[in-house]
């Protein structure tokens, strides 16, 4: 500071305003961390020091989280206590002082430049901190210390003042126009005359220029200013003083209390300073505490004369011509001070504001919304949603039929049942539409998924597309740091679907709320946290708030937030209706006076969030910015569901504080606005209070979207719909109109015009304020009392992008299905036509770097948008699913170079340029001549270039191109180089470093220049095969020429002298060309350099290839060290280039690779094409002379992309990202299918009848089809009916029809169920009324009988009706038997609605002849020729087959032909039993037809009486008249077909002479009674929901062994069998996944159908069972697409070799044929007890118990891989603790083809039966018995992982006890058996496993798996077997250990770690811990293993010596992808060990 200039720091008094100052501080604090910390610390100090104060003081402050909240309380009101005023003005001054100290540290100077300090009244307190502020840190500390002092001072003055007068009012007045002494005298006289006690008298406290301040009690001051003669007429002002000051009598004790006892107070004061404002400014103080006492005394007790202070100051500074006054905070005395100082002729500068600071680019704490998507009523996307808003549409409608039957629940008034008085809602058009294949979800699982979850998946993907999210190799966001927040609060879909679909393996994840968010993370492979939130109507706002919090806390880097609501459960309507919140008249009437509740609605929405700074850095489109968000609760509301306006206002203010904005900055408010009578006024009241003091004339516009689309209360219209609307307002720059307006407003609203709030009825421009963003306040509150709020800002980014230097660009699109493929292209094309001005570079950038890529791909390179449009229009073909091919880098040799060959890339590609420059630098350092111009300059003179320059330039170019390819993710699988190109190949493979390869090429070229004469030799290219070329050369008189290159099968190069080559060319007949090279490379001309070159090459390092090299010298692949060395390089220089041999070596090792040439132009590509003939699209050239480099590169990238290459698009575009913009291109074209279930109420749930009897539930539709349980409306119509077998009428039908003494449902019941169901459907969906006679049954087929044994007496018959074809009058009907979760397919038929008159007319033409035949049979019987039977005899004979109750016995007399081929009868139908209801009575149907059954089964000529003919269907049943009971009818039966095991009959029914019914093709098949008994009495214990197949009657034949040594050429005769196999595979996949066979295209990925590893095992087992062919569960890996299955399993009629047959023969040599050809054998129902040998040798019976709730234990052996019957002993691998062999599905194939069978746990499906009484011994008994049955002879090879290893050992023991030998045993990571039971530790073992497994989705278990794991843990803990005797031990045992323990997985679980420590369970290894019996079945696996822990670890006591292997993984990682290949290696070594001789 200049010596003639002085700084003055001015601190004003306590009455100054703090309003602007406090806002400015907090605004600056947003970008100044230390300032934010100070304000937080200051707040804490104030709050701490006021905790114990009295209620008056505490209440004056209230609750505040920060000082800005405190400021809000008094921004527009007066602080009658004064403490808040004191705190806030102090905070302003302290903050500004600290800022100045930071900005200008010299202000704390202690030398002659020390500023002067001036404090006016209470300003002295703020000033005092400077006395101890040698540094900024000390100043900071002192400010906090004085804050505590200020709090105590306020308390002292308040208490003192209130002791005089406890009332509100001003304690200070300013009086003008009277001197101080005159005023004192006047006050004394008047107060004395009024008798005012001295202690209460007002006094002069402060004197200024022509004014004085008097201080005293408010009542005294009021009296004085109004009545005192000397004052009452003078000008005067009331001051913001609310306690005594300058007039208080204080004692030393008072001052000590105020100053406090901090250690800082004792700090000595060494500074010399003047305290202007004190009576004695120059007084000296020993300590800071002394000074503070003096200051407090001055401010409290001593009057102040400001004029005197200023005069003294001016006098002292008279020698300083320049003064700099800095006002620390506001000061009302500043102008007086400066005027006095200026009056002496000095220059005075004034700084009355904060110190200068650099404003932040963005305010911190901002969150960018970078992507959004949504769908709801009337809209499938946000654009359509915006159109709904702009059109003011009200989308309320009556509840549609596809949700539920409204008539069942709607009542005009509520009654006691489940009723609703509203009919309305707002609904999505197609809530069930879902692209399941895109998300790899089977139709079966998709239907079980909550539609909200499905829709959320799709909107999330759409939002991610808008956000430009890409999952490529280079990612802007780490997937481990992406979080998902999903709002949901109901489980409607579970209630809708459960009683229709029952329970399934996918039910839990389908409807459980946590899966809404979890499935998002799973689908996109994210590892960040997932949250499923329920905060009722504010769930979305809450999810966004939590997402923002997580992002700001840096816990995550990207968040997906949103919610979904799809309403369809009627009881939600009924409960809400009864609670009175729903409108009975329609939609939400937001703001209106007729508001009467809200309207329920669908909506789904998603937003993608990032921190603003990250979004800018990632080049994202920022749709809007979340400036702040918040949530609180209406804790003081009148009820939990009532909103509290005060709580809402508090939240608004808090959020604005956090955002550093004020109510003046808000442009629009999107209100919750549900239209309820209480909620709307409360919300508007909160806004009115918030905006009551706005300073801007512009109105606040408010609106609410619920008036358009209703209120999806549980999840989103309360949040995400409003949010999407707000974002669109920013995007469109429009304030939209409010639906339902204009209209009279809610009368409970405050007067909106007075508070400047406006509700628009027409759209208007959304204008931007000057120099600040537009801001929207979005408000939500929920039904549970919560409030949520979001403050949005728009983001102005008007940066103009420069042009991309690249002139050609690659544009792509991709999909998962062909339909989506064409849809994506069409949508892109449409968008381009609508946006022709879009830049091609932005389209390319968006479609490549900012998209996720899928298998079916399109790519094209274009230079303009118009060119792109043309190419899109021209391409209409399908695209196959891409499969990634290996890439071969093919490096060009010399001879193709040209000037400027890399000039375009050098200018535009940083990677290429940097690599080329590096090569040039290295070459310069090695003293090689410059060559860069050859690459970079098109006008470079080529004729002047030497071989040295050319070869270095070509090599550098190729290395640069390779670097460019590798930088964008294209890595070669193998490299090959032609001649010089091999050097580039060796560098790229890692053999030669960059310096070495340049050195070798440069030195070799120098040697050539030195030793070889230029232009004396030549090279001739000839179009001849190498053999012909060689023969031609041999025939020459002078064979000096030689072959230099074998380029292709028909192209060679000859080298020799120019003379010889010229002569040779003249004699050639083949086409030839002289090459433009100066030397004869690869010829004898190179001989002079070889020795020296080899010596030079000996000095470089040759490393092992990291990438295989196809050597053109050796014609083989090289991937190991030792091949490349100096000698090789010399030979490579001299010997021919065998390019063909190298190509063939690649072809033999790599399947269908992509050939990518890297060089100056296309040269080697033609050689590849001529030699190998690959597809043209797989031969690529990086550069093409004469073509722009980016065009040729683009073509290469397009082809690579279409062939499945993973290109790092983000890396490609990164250098140019500042020139690129992310476009909002069309979203993915979904391939949608319908997954929807209509809710149908069961009978006992329907509303009961009302008292007036007008509203009752409907009776049963039919006894056989009682109620509708599902109704899906057209076009995908499906109606499902149920009928309970326990219904008395139904039960009588079954009980009255007995086969072999078992009740069996009559076949006529199925006809009745079908006819009744179709009749119902027709009446429901057709305008015409169709009667029964018009319905015809066709092709009825029954698969199995319906019995009580099948489903129990409480089972159900399910009838399903669906469209049967293109005709609307044809239906397919299917029947199932159901019990709980189990269902069985019973049969199906077609039902057609026909014209009965046409049928009758057709019959009338022939009925006479049939009726005549009836008469003939009757006459013949009466004459004794045929048989005449009375009913007693007929039904008595028939009882041998079937016994009927009386209701069925309607035959009055029967007439049977003598050959039993015809029969007739007279029938009189009985009335149906009371209580039944039929459309076509089964009693009548059975009675009219069962004569046919009698004829077939009672025929005396039948050869066997041990069989029964069962009716299993008919061709058709037609009827034109409804029969009547009591009326006689004639029936006629004729046998029309009779084969060995089947009989076909026709049945005709006559009413007199009129034919009224005809059953054609009634089919009976013969069944052995033994089989029939089993069929009728069998029980199926499966707990799955899928239909079980009918029993297979015939046995499989065991194929004979095949002599695999014999080669047979024959035409396959198995095409029909193969077709059956393929058909079975596809049908079973279809059934298991729920997919439609029609959707199975060749490119359909099986994983896309939802087939996971567990389902794969089920499918493989069923295929094996059905076809006899062993399909391995790994088929989903081996054959990933449907086309792969078709190629492998399709019928073949080609020559085949038996040893290569793809079918898998059975075990036929050393394995029992009991396994036959089945890869999956089940062994059911073992004995109910198993025998176990205990330690003592006694026999113990272990009772499994009845446990009727779970199936019996069952062993399943499944072929996992290998070839049965190949002479190898099978390896049996027992399932681990999960119980399922799915654990092993990731094991790669073993080259040995050893057959590996997996053995599931017998308790997999019944883990509750796996008790400790059963234990390891009991479980192993099941396995042992199954193995002995499967393999009666030979030795065994066993193994198991984890708990499976323990079972394997016990099976080994039991086999030994049965005298069966185990040859080899493989134990994978399992401790040896413990010598004792670990007490009370099993629970900790399970806790350990739960903690470690939940971190890995691959090990997340189902409930059943979890139960099995717990059971195996308990079993292992209690298993203490005897060691095997030496004679019983396996010959060889191998043990494989996991080297890593699982403790790292536990480290993040603090609770578990504490529990481990408490239990004393070790987490570190110690000697022999693996054998410690104190460690339970899991705890042993916690510590990491040392080398000493990788031995047998106790197993040697049980099995003897063992080979011990280990792998670097932990226990759970071993069988999982990423580590399973290591396990495969160790198992391979174990198998080799097993097979070793000896």
From Swiss-Prot:
SMART domains: PKS_AT (SM00827), PKS_KS (SM00825), PKS_PP (SM00823). Residues 1221-1572 are annotated as: Product template (PT) domain. One of its GO terms (biological process) is fatty acid biosynthetic process. Residues 1778-1882 are annotated as: Thioesterase (TE) domain. It is an enzyme of class 2 (transferase). Pfam families: Acyl_transf_1 (PF00698), CurL-like_PKS_C (PF22621), ketoacyl-synt (PF00109), Ketoacyl-synt_C (PF02801), PP-binding (PF00550), SAT (PF16073), Thioesterase (PF00975). One of its GO terms (molecular function) is 3-oxoacyl-[acyl-carrier-protein] synthase activity. Residues 1254-1405 are annotated as: N-terminal hotdog fold. InterPro entries: AB_hydrolase_fold, Ac_transferase_dom_sf, ACP-like_sf, Acyl_transferase_dom, Acyl_Trfase/lysoPLipase, Ketoacyl_synth_AS, Ketoacyl_synth_C, Ketoacyl_synth_N. The keyword Transferase applies. Residues 364-794 form the Ketosynthase family 3 (KS3) domain. PANTHER family: FATTY ACID SYNTHASE, SI:DKEY-61P9.11. Non-reducing polyketide synthase; part of the gene cluster that mediates the biosynthesis of zearalenone (ZEA), a nonsteroid estrogen that is a contaminant of cereal grains and causes estrogenic disorders in humans and animals. The ZEA backbone is synthesized from a single acetyl-CoA molecule and eight malonyl-CoA molecules. The reducing polyketide synthase ZEA2 is proposed to synthesize a reduced hexaketide intermediate by using different combinations of its reductive domains during each round of condensation. This is Non-reducing polyketide synthase ZEA1. It comes from Gibberella zeae (strain ATCC MYA-4620 / CBS 123657 / FGSC 9075 / NRRL 31084 / PH-1). The gene is ZEA1.
């Amino acid at each position: 500071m200049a010596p003639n200039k002085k700084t003055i720091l001015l601190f004003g008094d306590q009455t100054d305003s703090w309003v602007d100052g406090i806002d400015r501080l907090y605004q600056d604090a947003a970008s100044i961390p230390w300032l934010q910390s100070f304000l937080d610390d200051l707040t804490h100090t104030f709050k701490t020091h006021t905790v114990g104060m009295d209620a008056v003081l505490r209440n004056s402050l209230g609750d505040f989280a920060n000082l800005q909240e405190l400021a809000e309380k008094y921004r527009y009101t007066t602080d009658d206590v004064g403490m808040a005023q004191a705190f806030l003005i102090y905070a302003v001054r302290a903050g500004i002082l600290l800022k100045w100290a930071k900005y200008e540290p010299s202000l704390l100077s202690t030398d002659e430049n020390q500023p002067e300090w001036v404090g006016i009244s209470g300003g002295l307190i703020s000033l005092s901190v400077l006395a101890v502020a040698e540094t900024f840190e000390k100043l900071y500390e002192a400010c906090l210390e004085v804050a505590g002092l200020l709090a105590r001072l306020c308390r002292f003055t308040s208490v003192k003042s209130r002791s005089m007068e406890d009332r509100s009012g001003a304690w200070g007045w300013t009086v003008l126009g009277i001197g101080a002494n005159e005023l004192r005298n006047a006050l004394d006289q008047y107060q004395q005359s009024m008798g005012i006690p001295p202690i209460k008298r007002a006094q002069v406290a402060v004197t200024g220029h022509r004014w004085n301040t008097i201080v005293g009690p408010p009542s005294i001051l009021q009296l004085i200013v109004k009545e005192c003669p000397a004052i009452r007429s003078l000008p005067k002002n009331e001051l913001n003083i609310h306690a005594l000051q300058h007039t208080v009598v204080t004692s030393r004790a008072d001052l000590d209390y105020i100053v406090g006892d901090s250690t800082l107070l004792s700090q000595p004061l060494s500074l010399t300073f003047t305290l202007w404002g004190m009576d004695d400014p120059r007084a000296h103080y020993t300590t800071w505490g002394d000074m503070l006492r003096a200051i407090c005394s001055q401010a409290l007790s001593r009057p102040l004369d400001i004029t005197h202070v200023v005069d003294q100051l001016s006098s002292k500074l008279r020698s300083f011509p320049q003064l700099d006054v800095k006002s620390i905070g506001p000061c009302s005395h500043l102008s007086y001070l400066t005027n006095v100082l200026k009056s002496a002729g000095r220059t005075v500068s004034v700084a009355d504001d904060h110190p200068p600071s650099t404003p932040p680019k963005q305010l911190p704490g901002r969150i960018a919304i970078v992507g959004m998507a949504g769908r709801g009523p009337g809209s499938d996307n946000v654009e359509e949603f915006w159109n709904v808003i702009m059109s003011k549409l009200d989308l309320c409608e009556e509840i549609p039929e596809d949700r539920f039957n409204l008539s069942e629940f709607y009542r005009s008034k509520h009654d006691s049942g489940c009723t609703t008085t509203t009919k309305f809602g707002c609904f999505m058009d197609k809530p069930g539409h879902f692209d399941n294949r895109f998300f790899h979800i089977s139709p079966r699982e998709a239907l079980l998924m909550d539609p909200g979850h499905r829709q959320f998946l799709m909107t999330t993907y759409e939002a991610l597309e808008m956000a430009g999210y890409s999952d490529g190799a280079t990612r802007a966001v780490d997937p481990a740091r992406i979080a998902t927040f999903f709002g949901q609060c109901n489980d409607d879909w579970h209630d809708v679907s459960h009683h229709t679909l029952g329970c399934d393996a996918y039910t839990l994840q389908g409807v459980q709320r946590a899966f809404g968010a979890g499935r998002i993370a799973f689908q996109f492979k994210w590892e960040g946290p997932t949250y499923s939130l329920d905060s009722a109507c504010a769930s979305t706002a809450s999810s966004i708030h939590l997402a923002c919090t997580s992002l700001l806390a840096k816990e995550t880097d990207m968040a997906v937030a949103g919610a979904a609501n799809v309403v369809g459960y009627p009881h939600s309507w009924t409960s809400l209706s009864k609670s009175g919140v729903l409108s009975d008249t329609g939609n939400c009437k937001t703001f209106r006076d007729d508001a009467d509740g809200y309207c329920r609605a669908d909506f789904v929405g998603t937003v993608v969030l990032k921190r603003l700074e990250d979004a800018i850095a990632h080049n994202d489109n920022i749709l809007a910015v979340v400036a702040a968000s918040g949530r609180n609760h209406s804790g003081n509301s009148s009820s939990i569901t009532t909103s509290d306006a005060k709580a809402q206002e508090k939240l608004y203010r808090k959020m604005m504080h956090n955002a550093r904005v004020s109510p003046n900055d808000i442009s629009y408010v999107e209100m919750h606005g549900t239209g309820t009578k209480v909620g709307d006024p409360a919300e508007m009241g909160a806004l009115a209070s918030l905006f009551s003091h706005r300073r801007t004339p512009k109105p606040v516009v408010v609106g609410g979207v619920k008036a358009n689309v209703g209120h999806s209360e549980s999840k989103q219209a309360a949040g995400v719909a409003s949010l999407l609307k707000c974002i669109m307002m920013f995007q469109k720059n429009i304030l939209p109109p409010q639906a339902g307006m204009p209209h009279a407003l809610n009368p409970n609203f405050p007067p909106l015009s007075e508070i400047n709030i406006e509700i628009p009825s027409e759209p208007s421009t959304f204008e931007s304020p000057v120099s600040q963003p537009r801001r929207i306040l979005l408000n939500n509150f929920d039904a549970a009392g919560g409030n949520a709020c979001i403050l949005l800002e728009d983001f102005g980014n008007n940066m103009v992008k420069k042009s991309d230097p690249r002139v050609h660009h690659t544009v792509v699109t991709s999909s998962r299905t062909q339909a989506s493929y064409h849809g994506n292209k069409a949508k892109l094309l449409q968008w381009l036509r609508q946006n022709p001005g879009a830049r091609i570079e932005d389209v390319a950038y968006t479609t490549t770097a900012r998209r996720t890529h899928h298998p079916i791909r399109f790519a094209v390179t274009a230079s303009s948008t118009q060119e792109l449009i043309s190419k899109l229009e021209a391409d209409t073909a399908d695209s196959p699913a891409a499969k990634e091919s290996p890439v071969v880098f093919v490096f060009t040799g010399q001879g193709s170079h040209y000037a400027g060959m890399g000039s375009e890339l050098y200018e535009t590609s940083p990677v290429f340029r940097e690599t080329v420059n590096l090569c040039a630098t290295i070459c310069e350092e090695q003293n090689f001549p410059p060559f860069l111009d050859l690459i970079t300059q098109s006008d470079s003179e080529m004729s002047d270039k030497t071989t040295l320059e050319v070869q270095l330039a070509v090599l550098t170019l190729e290395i640069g191109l390779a670097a460019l390819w590798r930088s964008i993710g294209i890595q070669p699988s193998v490299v090959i180089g032609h001649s010089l190109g091999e050097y580039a190949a060796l560098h790229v493979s890692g053999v030669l470093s960059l310096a070495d390869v340049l050195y070798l090429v440069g030195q070799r070229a120098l040697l050539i220049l030195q030793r070889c004469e230029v232009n004396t030799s030549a090279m001739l290219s000839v179009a001849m095969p190498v053999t012909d070329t060689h023969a031609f050369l041999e025939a020459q008189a002078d064979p000096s020429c030689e072959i230099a290159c074998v380029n292709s099968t028909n192209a060679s190069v000859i080298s020799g002298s120019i003379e010889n080559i010229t002569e040779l060319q003249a004699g050639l007949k083949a086409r030839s060309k002289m090459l433009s090279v100066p030397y004869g490379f690869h010829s004898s001309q190179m001989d002079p350099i070889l020795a020296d070159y080899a010596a030079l090459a000996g000095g470089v390092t040759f490393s092992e290839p990291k990438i295989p090299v196809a050597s053109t010298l050796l014609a083989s692949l090289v991937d190991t060290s030792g091949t490349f060395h100096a000698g090789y390089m010399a030979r490579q220089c001299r010997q021919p280039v065998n390019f063909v041999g190298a190509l063939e070596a690649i072809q033999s090792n790599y399947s269908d690779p992509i050939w990518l040439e890297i060089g100056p132009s296309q040269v080697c590509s033609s050689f590849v094409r001529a030699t190998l003939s690959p597809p043209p699209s797989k031969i690529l050239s990086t550069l093409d002379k004469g073509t722009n480099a980016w065009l040729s590169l683009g073509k290469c990238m397009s082809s690579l992309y279409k062939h499945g290459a993973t290109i790092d698009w983000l890396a490609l575009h990164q250098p140019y990202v500042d020139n690129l913009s992310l476009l909002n291109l069309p979203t993915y074209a979904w391939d949608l299918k319908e997954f929807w279930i209509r809710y149908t109420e069961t009978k006992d749930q329907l509303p009961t009848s009302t008292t007036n009897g007008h509203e009752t539930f409907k009776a049963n539709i039919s006894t056989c089809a009682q109620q509708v349980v599902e109704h899906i409306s057209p076009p995908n119509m499906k109606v499902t009916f149920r009928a309970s077998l326990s219904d008395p009428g139904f039960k009588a039908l079954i009980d009255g029809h007995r086969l072999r003494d078992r009740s069996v449902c009559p076949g006529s019941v199925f006809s009745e169920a079908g006819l009744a169901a179709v009749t119902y459907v027709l009446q429901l969906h057709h305008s015409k009324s169709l009667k029964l006679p018009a319905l015809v049954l066709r092709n009825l087929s029954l698969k199995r009988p319906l019995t009580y044994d099948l489903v129990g007496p409480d089972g159900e018959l399910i009838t399903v009706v669906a469209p049967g074809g293109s005709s609307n009058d044809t239906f397919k009907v299917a029947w199932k038997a159901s019990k709980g979760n189990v269902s069985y397919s019973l049969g199906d038929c077609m039902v057609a609605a026909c014209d009965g008159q046409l049928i009758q007319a057709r019959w009338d033409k022939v009925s006479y002849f049939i009726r005549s035949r009836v008469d003939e049979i009757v006459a013949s019987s009466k004459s004794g020729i045929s048989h005449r039977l009375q009913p007693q005899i007929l039904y008595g004979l028939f009882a041998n087959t079937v016994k009927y109750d009386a209701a069925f016995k309607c035959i009055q007399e029967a007439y049977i032909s003598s050959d039993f081929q015809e029969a007739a009868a007279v029938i009189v139908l009985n009335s149906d039993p009371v209580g039944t209801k039929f459309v076509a009575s089964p009693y009548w149907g059975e009675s009219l037809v069962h004569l046919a059954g009698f004829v077939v089964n009672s025929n005396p000529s039948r050869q066997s009486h041990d069989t029964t003919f069962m009716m299993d269907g008919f061709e058709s049943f037609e009827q034109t008249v409804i029969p009547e009971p009591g009326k006689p009818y004639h029936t006629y039966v004729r046998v029309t077909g009779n084969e060995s095991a089947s009989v076909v009959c026709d049945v005709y029914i006559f009413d007199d002479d009129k034919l009224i019914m005809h059953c054609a093709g009634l089919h009976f098949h013969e069944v052995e009674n033994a089989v029939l008994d089993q069929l009728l009495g069998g029980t199926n214990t499966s707990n799955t929901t899928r239909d079980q197949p009918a029993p297979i009657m015939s046995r499989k034949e065991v194929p004979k062994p095949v002599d695999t040594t014999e080669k047979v050429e024959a035409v396959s005769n198995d095409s029909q069998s193969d077709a059956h196999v393929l058909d079975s595979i596809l049908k079973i996949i279809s059934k298991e996944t729920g997919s439609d066979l029609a959707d199975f295209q060749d490119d359909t990925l099986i994983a896309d159908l939802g087939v996971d590893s567990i389902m794969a095992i089920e499918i493989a087992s069923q295929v094996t069972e059905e076809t006899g062919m062993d399909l391995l569960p790994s088929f989903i890996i081996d054959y990933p697409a449907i086309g792969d299955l078709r190629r492998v399993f399709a019928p073949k009629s080609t020559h085949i070799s038996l040893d290569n047959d793809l079918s898998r023969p059975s075990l036929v040599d050393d394995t029992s044929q009991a396994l036959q050809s089945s890869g999956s054998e089940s062994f059911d129902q073992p004995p109910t007890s198993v025998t176990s040998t205990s330690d003592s040798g006694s026999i113990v019976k272990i009772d499994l118990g009845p446990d009727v709730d779970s199936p019996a234990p069952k062993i399943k052996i499944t072929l996992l891989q290998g070839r049965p019957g190949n002479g190898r002993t099978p390896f049996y691998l027992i399932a681990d603790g999960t119980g399922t062999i799915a654990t092993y599905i990731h094991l790669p194939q073993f080259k040995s083809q050893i057959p590996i069978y997996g053995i599931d746990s017998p308790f997999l499906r019944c883990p509750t039966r796996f008790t400790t009484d059963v234990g390891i011994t009991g479980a192993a008994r099941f396995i042992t018995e199954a193995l002995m049955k499967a393999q009666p002879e030979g030795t065994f090879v066993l193994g198991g992982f984890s708990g499976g290893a323990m079972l394997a050992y016990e099976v080994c023991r039991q086999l030994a006890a049965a005298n069966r030998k185990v040859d080899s045993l493989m134990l994978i990571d399992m401790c040896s058996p413990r010598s004792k039971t670990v007490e009370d530790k099993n629970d900790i073992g399970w806790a350990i496993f739960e903690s470690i497994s939940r971190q890995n989705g691959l090990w997340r278990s189902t409930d059943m798996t979890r139960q099995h794991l717990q059971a195996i843990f308990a079993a292992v803990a209690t298993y203490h077997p005897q060691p095997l005797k030496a004679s019983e031990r396996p010959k060889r045992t191998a043990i494989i250990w996991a080297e890593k323990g699982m403790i790292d997985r536990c480290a993040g679980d603090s609770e578990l770690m504490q529990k481990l420590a408490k239990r004393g369970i070790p987490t570190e290894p110690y000697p022999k811990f693996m054998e410690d019996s104190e460690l339970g079945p899991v705890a042993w696996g916690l510590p990491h293993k040392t080398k000493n822990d990788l031995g047998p670890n106790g197993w040697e006591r049980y099995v003897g010596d063992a080979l011990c292997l280990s792998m670097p993984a932990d226990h759970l990682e071993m069988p999982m992808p990423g580590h399973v290949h290591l396990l495969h290696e160790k198992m391979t070594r174990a198998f080799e060990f097993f097979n070793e001789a000896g």
